[in-house]
């Protein structure tokens, strides 16, 4: 008879969790940041608020964003005028959009990841789906299982209302699933659509206006498993460790509340300061076991909450400008897509590294860090090990 200990040992994988494929997707509707203030104030019937419009223009100019993708078109917004007001009851209209579009966008990203992975989708054993865009039962995990035609026995986990740190959270969870279930192949999907947060401007809620200048739509998907099959599965990054922490004195720094008016967004001015003040402690705890203390020796994947956060982190840690290149490129081309951002940055980094012949998936470097920041204020820290290209 097999003992519990022997059975448990047989369940565990031998090697570390490994990213084996990445896919991304956006809606087709592309928004030019330079013309967005005019469009936004026109579609929300707010053109008379000239001073506020000037403030919004400055926010968009400072955002370092060139373009974003949004499911919400002018046509959709005209059909749902309550979404264009500042605080009109509109949750039903928003929910009707996101319960369909969030899994649909997730499917696009997942199909790309599965295609790159090159294995039959029947080999997917676990599904982790994450979104801050609406809630429903059965959830997006169920909808995606149906849309992709995954096995009914796939083990699902649905994460709602996590916010911008969740790209790190899903990697942490997928790491544990892959390493503790021999042969597991975990499909991770983060899909975000701003239909829940879009609303008209108001003088008394400027942090909401910041969100209107930064947020975009996108979905990222990755396949994670341990012990890749040689010659069949191609590793991209290894997940070495993962940690989550709440920053001290940060209560109320980033909040979101689901109301009749949709998801309201609240942001304190000191968020960049709170993150930059505490980030080195997270780095030290993560990299001390590896004997690494030179932050410029790492490749960087940081959630691009906004340019102020990136600037302050760069200054605080003395990072060379090129360290946050991949992060800034994604912010510029897509905006802040909440949980999906870090998956886009992983994709950007491995593609740029291969194109430039840098030797590893991590810009030619061996070790890297992935950071997620969000409500709480919560920080996710994932230590990555690159793979030779």
Curated annotation (Swiss-Prot):
Keyword annotations: Acyltransferase, Flavonoid biosynthesis, Transferase
Catalytic residues of the enzyme: 164
Tissues expressing the protein: Major expressed member of the gene family in various floral tissues and in seedlings treated with UV light. It is relatively low expressed in tissue culture material.
Protein's GO biological process: flavonoid biosynthetic process; polyketide biosynthetic process
Recorded catalytic activity of this chain's protein: (E)-4-coumaroyl-CoA + 3 malonyl-CoA + 3 H(+) = 2',4,4',6'-tetrahydroxychalcone + 3 CO2 + 4 CoA
Annotated SUPFAM superfamilies: Thiolase-like
CDD domains in alphabetical order: CHS_like (cd00831)
EC number: 2.3.1.74
Entry keyword Transferase: yes
Coiled coil feature spans: none
GO molecular function, one term: naringenin-chalcone synthase activity
Role noted for this protein: The primary product of this enzyme is 4,2',4',6'-tetrahydroxychalcone (also termed naringenin-chalcone or chalcone) which can under specific conditions spontaneously isomerize into naringenin.
Protein name, UniProt field: Chalcone synthase A
Originating species: Petunia hybrida
